[in-house]
């Protein structure tokens, strides 16, 4: 991470974007698992 010392304001934005993406991916996977579980 070479841009951490030069751009301290860019790191939290990327972390929030990554956490948001992981959260949406987790909800998407859980939705698929629950839908397949209920349809079976």
UniProtKB/Swiss-Prot annotation:
Q: InterPro entries in the record, alphabetically?
A: PSII_PsbL, PSII_PsbL_sf
Location(s), subcellular: Cellular thylakoid membrane
Q: Where are the transmembrane segments?
A: 19-39
Question: What keyword terms does UniProt attach to this protein?
Answer: Membrane, Photosynthesis, Photosystem II, Reaction center, Thylakoid, Transmembrane, Transmembrane helix
Describe its membrane topology.
Answer: Single-pass membrane protein
GO cellular component annotations, sorted alphabetically? photosystem II reaction center; plasma membrane-derived thylakoid membrane
Q: Which Pfam families match?
A: PsbL
* GO biological-process terms attached to the record: photosynthesis
UniProt family annotation: Belongs to the PsbL family.
Q: What does this protein do?
A: One of the components of the core complex of photosystem II (PSII). PSII is a light-driven water:plastoquinone oxidoreductase that uses light energy to abstract electrons from H(2)O, generating O(2) and a proton gradient subsequently used for ATP formation. It consists of a core antenna complex that captures photons, and an electron transfer chain that converts photonic excitation into a charge separation. This subunit is found at the monomer-monomer interface and is required for correct PSII assembly and/or dimerization.
Assembly behavior: PSII is composed of 1 copy each of membrane proteins PsbA, PsbB, PsbC, PsbD, PsbE, PsbF, PsbH, PsbI, PsbJ, PsbK, PsbL, PsbM, PsbT, PsbX, PsbY, PsbZ, Psb30/Ycf12, peripheral proteins PsbO, CyanoQ (PsbQ), PsbU, PsbV and a large number of cofactors. It forms dimeric complexes.
What this protein is called in its record is Photosystem II reaction center protein L
Q: Supply the source organism for this entry.
A: Synechococcus elongatus (strain ATCC 33912 / PCC 7942 / FACHB-805) (Anacystis nidulans R2)
């Amino acid at each position: 991470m070479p841009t951490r010392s030069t751009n301290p304001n860019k790191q939290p934005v990327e972390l929030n974007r990554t956490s948001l993406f992981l959260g949406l991916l987790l909800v998407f996977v859980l939705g698929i698992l629950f839908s397949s579980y209920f349809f079976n």
